[in-house]
Structures are given as structure tokens and as C-alpha cells.
Amino acid sequence: MNARIDTGNEAFSAAELATAESRASATPMMEQYIEIKANNPDSLLFYRMGDFYELFFEDALEASRALGITLTKRGQHMGQDIPMCGVPVHAADDYLQKLISLGFRVAVCEQIEDPAEAKKRGAKSVVRRDVVRLVTPGTITEEKLLSPSESNYLMALTRIRGSGEALLALAWIDISTGVFRLAETEASRLLADILRIDPRELILPDTIFHDPELKPVFDVLGRTAVPQPSVLFDSASAEGRIARYFGVATLDGFGTFSRAELAAAAAAVAYVEKTQIAERPPLGKPERESAASTLFIDPATRANLELARTLSGDRNGSLLKAIDRTVTGGGARLLAERLMSPLTDPARINARLDSIGFLIDEPLLCGNLRDTLKHVPDMPRALSRLALDRGGPRDLSAIRQGLDAAGGVAVMLGKAVLPEELGQALSELQALPATLEKLLAETLAEELPLLKRDGGFLRDGANAELDEVRALRDQSRRVIAGLQLQYAEETGIRSLKIKHNNVLGYFIEVTAGNASPMTETADAKARFIHRQTMANAMRFTTTELADLESRIANAADQALTIELEAFDRMTAAVVAEAEAIKSGARALAVIDVAAGLALLAEEQAYCRPQVDGSKMFAIESGRHPVVEQALRRQAGGPFVANHCDLSPKTGDRDGAIWLLTGPNMGGKSTFLRQNALISILAQMGSFVPATSAHIGIVDRLFSRVGASDDLARGRSTFMVEMVETAAILNQASDRSLVILDEIGRGTATFDGLSIAWAAVEHLHEANRCRGLFATHFHELTVLSEKLGRLSNATMRVKEWDGDVIFLHEVGPGAADRSYGIQVARLAGLPASVVARARDVLTRLEDADRKNPASQLIDDLPLFQVAVRREETARGASKVEEALKAMSLDDMTPREAMDALYDLKKKLK
């Protein structure tokens, strides 16, 4: 009997178990376990024993803590108790889900022979077992373990060095849908590309994993990054490995790939082969992505804008949640993919917009399509499970239902003149095999079991031999009912019943008090053979009942054999059409996304953006797509729409920059974010929340909005702000869109103002990008006098009877106040503190009026023409003395500027 033991006990590690001494002292069963565990040291080993998967030693300690299950012991090994825990086989998926979500990897070890076969090899022979599958976060296919709306990518990263340069490449595979893509990348954008694709598991050579230059990337990814032996990423054998997987002699028909891309793709394929053991998922041919084909969004921007999840990790409140009107799993995944990877090709963007516009103009068709799509199961994932021999009757049914719905969608679309994208989708739907749908419809029953081993999934009439066996089974049931009546009359025991269990099979049961007619005479004893006595009942059998049981058992076995053979034939027929099914499923997803975005545009009054290769950025009455919907749900009144025009001014080639000032709580951050989100929506191929929008392609989007520290990496809030700002200033191009909110606020006033001033100049003169720059440094507004493409804008307010009303409207001009004290009063600061703050503010403003910031603009040349003069020893000495005497943190902005004038005089 298993006894509970202390979960804090130490246990043998995998390395300790693998020693010769350990193996020599193990029982035959434990020796087998140790050998299998030694081959899978980085995985929890689910060791099959009857109806349970059991875990031992260190695995048991980890699993019991992670799963919250009882830790017991099973005998001893080398004088120590063996920790053990287990999970039922029928509930294994639930436990796997939790372990995978916690980042564990699991090796599933099954019995590959039954005990009877083991005994033939010797009375003490151990049943043969082996690992049939490695379950890792990036290689799962079970429906319970997957999110219907999210892809489940395995990604491989590799690096090839040559001609003084290191080329990085990524390959990513979703074995649950067959998606297979690859792309080159650079160290500077590696994290951004990984987060864009959002893999569940990233494999990489251990040499890269320990590279100091890339360590910050893997620190962010945490347990997602899994180092592997470098041999897995060998570029010399890469092409051959991929060709063998797809059964082709050459990859010439797949396209042209770099050595780094091939190495990454081959590593991903090798890892799939390693984890799936003997099975092979039906992967699509590898497709190459170009970095220039998608809008670059750096990691900080992706997080700040809360595209797929909020900063707290919640899907609710994200842009994806706000725009998702899809009704299929494939559609939801495609929508997320498009949102995370907006395009930079106007032609492809406009093709998507054409589809949405067409369905808006055809509301009846759009509604009918969505009604049909609601009944489309997840065909790609059902296909993958069937191909990997993990499927069941309901997966076959999913293929049948999907093919049937696809036929209905094709009929609807076939009656219309379609735009390009929908026309291509229709062609793929029309290419689906009608004979396969007919086969499945004529073969599968209406009500289906979860597991094929349960049988009963073939409809009556589908197989003549099966019908005969079922008739025998049904006839036997009638015979049993007749025997029960016969035995009751023969013995005079009206309560006599014929029952069945897995131990005795069929048996006669009577109460102990009524059993005498079956036990008193020799004839009765010969006829009714005693099987079992219980507290209140006795059980018997007869020769004819035993014969009938044998016939029924044989019929059931024969029926299941027939059904399993039919299942294998149907599965083979489905897998043979894998490419067509995946293409058809993708077409349904495209239609679902277009119909969902059409519905969104209609219900939220979105407009079609004009997207082209210009540098325009003109938004009329733009709104924040997430905040607007939240206000409607909360009955909080209408969202205040605002214009934004960063288009090149007359005579200029480059876009404009708005310097936005205004009060706290005035809506600056919302305005900044909404314009970034509108650009993303437009380039993903969606209508946008505005009355009109003209957007020239943005190649890179940067958003520095909000503030947070990074304590784990020893970074203060200000340091994080500066790192992110540095990335923007170093990477933004003249086609980029830059959104900056209150740069410099995290340090002393003088320092912060100086940094913000220089950043605005750099964006204008060096980056020459389109941008929105929000600030509370009102001194910066004087820059509009010297920077031709810089305009001032402000959040309007109204003062009424001592109170301030935030209008949330953007207009031209500069704010003269930030109304911070009014906000402090609204927040509940003590009245005495508010009064004192007003007094201090009045004194500071009086001092500031004596030395207006406009004087500073004449004394500070633009950074790009400023020539740093060599300081004389005498001048430098005076400046140093003056600087040492200053207390910068105690200075007001006005005092800081006065100090600048004095320092300059000392340098002359």
C-alpha cells in the first residue's frame, strides 16, 4: 500500500539514477524506468502502468508540486524511499495542459506489449515500454491543450557566420495547422521578430543561448527559449533533411533560401521528428517572409499599444479583442496574425480592403456567410491529429462538417462578381474534394464517441459485415432478456436478474434469502453454477449463459475490428487530401476575417483608409478603437473624435511632427495611441475608426507611451525610458511614425528639458519622420519658430467657476498651463497641500515671466549645425567651478536657463 511521504525530501536526479551502481541495484521494472529516463533527462517521464501514468524520483517531486497531487512512495532504491505520484490515463490531457502551461516538457512512455506477451518471454519479464511522444509547448496538437484563437508555434533560431558577418534566421512551424515559415533577421530586430510571431517554444544552439550579445533577448523570453545541441542546426545537412521530410529530391520547387534559413528550417523539422517519434504531421511547404514586407514594431511599442494583450497580460482590453468579430478558430488566428504583422505593400493591403468593402455593400451575403461559417470546425487541427494517429471519430466529423460548410460558402460566393482576394478563396474552396465529403457523410454516424476504441461511430448500412455482427449483438441482448424471464419462472424467483460486469461477465443475481431454489438439490446445483456470495446476494451462471456471453464478446470484438479498419481507411483518405483541406481551411479563414471586419466597420462606423506609397498621414475625426467601445459599454458618453495631419507641408518631402501640450487628464496619451493604432489597422487591411484617413505606408512604428521600471535588469523607470528613446532615435527613418509621450519627465527638470529639446530636434532634422511628441515642457513650443515641419497642438480645456473642464479636443497652439494642481485636488490631496501648491506655482510663474523661453531659441543652434568649440583651459575651469556650485535638482526651469546664459558667457 502506498504511504504519504514528505514532499520536501530529496530524490535521486536523472544523472544519479543513470550510474552503474544505481542500475545494478534496481528491480527489473525500475531498471527499465531508469534506462528510459536516462534517454529523456530534460522531460518529466509519464511511465504507463495499467490505467495510470506514474512518475518517480525527482520527476515525482516536481510533478506533485506543480499539479497539487499526492506524493506517495513505491518501495526503495539504494536504501531510500522512491517518491511516486500518478495521474489517470483518461485524465492525462488535463494534467498535461497544466504542466505545459508551466513550461514543463513531458515524455509519454506507453506499454508496447500486453502482459501475456511479456510472460511468453519469461515469468519475470517486464512488459516492454518505450517513449512514443515528447510533449513540449511548441509541439502539442490535443484540442484541450490548444487555444482555438491562437497559433501554437515552434520556432528555431540559427546563426551562420561568413564573410565577417553573422546571419540570423528564424523558422517557425505550427504542427497543429501545418503552417511553416522562415525569415532572415538581425540581432537588432531579433526580439521584435520573435515577439511578433509569439512562439510557444524557441529552440536554438547552446552556443547562441550563451552569447552575451543576445542574452538580453533570452532573458525576456525566459523558459520559452530551449537550448539544443548545435549538431541539430548543421547547415551542411539541412537541405537533405528537409527534402527527406517532404519526400522530394530537391528543394528547387520550394523557392530560394539562404543557408541560415535552411539551417533553421531543418532544425525545426528535426525537432518535430524528435518529439513525434514515428509520426509526421502534414506540414505545408516552407514559405519565406521578407523583413521589408511587414511593418516593424519594436517590443516596447508592441507592449505599450496593447495589441494582443494588455500590459497585465489580459486579452480583454486589447486591440485584438476590440476588433475580433470572427466566428471560426482559423479566422481568429488569421486576424491575430494580420494584426501582429501589418503589411507594407499597398497593393496587398488594398486587396484586403476590397474584400471588406465588397461585403459591406452586400450585407445579406455577409450575414449568410457568417451564419454558415459558425458551423465550421477547426479542420487543420483535426487533420493534424488524424495524421499523427491521435485523432478520433469526432475529428473525422470535423472534416466532414468543414467540407460541407465550405461547399455552402462556395455556392454563395459563386453567384457574385468577387474582388481578387475573395475570388482566390472561392477557387480554393471549389478545389476541395467532394468525394471525400460524400464518403464521410455516408459512413459516419450522427452521434459519435470521443475515442475510436469505443466503437459505434459507423452508421447503420455503411458496412454490410458490421450490420450482421451488430444484428447478432442485438439479437443476443434479446436472448438474455428471454433467459432472465425463463430462469425467473423456472425458479419462482421474480426478482432474479441477469447482470454484467468486467470481472464475472454475465451472471444471474438473486437475493440471499431467495437463493434456495438454486442451491437445494443436486440438479439445481448442476444447472446453476455458483460464482460469488455477497452480503445480501448470490451470483450464478449457466452453461447457456456462458456460451451466449462468448458469442456476444466475439461479436463486439469483431464489430470493433471492422470499425477500426474503416476508421483507418477514412483517415488515409483524409490525409491524402491534406493540401487541399489546408488550402480550403485557409480560404474559409480569409472569408471569416473579411466578413468579421466588415461587420466591425458597419457597427462602429469605420471608414476605408486610403493607403498608398506617399508620406501622407491625414486622419479626420479619428477615435481610439478600444476606448470608444469601452465608453459605449459603460454608457459613458460619446468618444471625442480628433483630427491629426502629419502629412508633408507644401514644398516638403517629409512628414510633419506635432508637439502636443496640454493638461494632465486632457487625453494626450489616448490621442497618441489612437493614431498609432489607426496606422496599424490600416496596414493590416482593416477599415479604421475615423471619418476619413489617408495613410502613406509606415515602415517602422515606434511608440514610447507610459513609464515602468525593469528591476530585474537593474533599470530605473528613467533608464528604461532612455533606452527605448535611444532605439527610436537610432532606428526611425523618414517613413517611420514615432509616438513619444513626455520624454525626460523621469529626471531633474533641467536634464529632462534638455533631453526632450534635443530629441525633438533629432527627430525633425535627422530622422525626418512623421511624429507626435507630447510634453509638459512648455518651453519646447518655441521650437516651432525654427523647425519648419514642427507644429504646436494642444488639448483644449475650459475653466468654469474655479473648476477645469477637460474637453479632450485637439487644436492648434500651445498650452500655457498643465492644470496639475486641479488634477491633484480632484485626486483628493489635502486642501492645505493644494493651497500651498497654488502659492508656490504663482511664485514660480512670476519668476518665469521675467525670462521667457523664447530668448533661448536664439542662443541654442540646432544640434546638426552646432560646432563644439574646443574649450580653453581657462574657460573650462570657470565652467567647471560654476557647475560644481550649482544644485541642479533644486533649480526651476527659469533658473536653469539663466544658468545656461552665465555658462555661455564664461566660455567666450
UniProtKB/Swiss-Prot annotation:
- Source taxon at top rank: Bacteria
Record carries keyword DNA damage: yes
Q: Which InterPro entries match?
A: DNA_mismatch_repair_MutS, DNA_mismatch_repair_MutS-lik_N, DNA_mismatch_repair_MutS/MSH, DNA_mismatch_repair_MutS_C, DNA_mismatch_repair_MutS_clamp, DNA_mismatch_repair_MutS_core, DNA_mismatch_repair_MutS_N, DNA_mismatch_repair_MutS_sf
CDD domains, alphabetized: ABC_MutS1 (cd03284)
| Biological processes annotated in GO | mismatch repair
MF (Gene Ontology):
ATP binding; ATP-dependent DNA damage sensor activity; damaged DNA binding; mismatched DNA binding
User: Does the UniProt entry include the keyword Repeat?
Assistant: no
Q: Which GO terms describe its cellular component?
A: cytosol
Which parts of the sequence bind ATP? Answer: 662-669
Print the keywords alphabetically: ATP-binding, DNA damage, DNA repair, DNA-binding, Nucleotide-binding
**What are the disulfide bonds?**
none
Family statement: Belongs to the DNA mismatch repair MutS family.
Q: What does this protein do?
A: This protein is involved in the repair of mismatches in DNA. It is possible that it carries out the mismatch recognition step. This protein has a weak ATPase activity.
Name listed for the protein in its UniProt record: DNA mismatch repair protein MutS
Q: The organism's lineage?
A: Bacteria, Pseudomonadati, Pseudomonadota, Alphaproteobacteria, Hyphomicrobiales
Q: Which gene name belongs to this protein? A: mutS
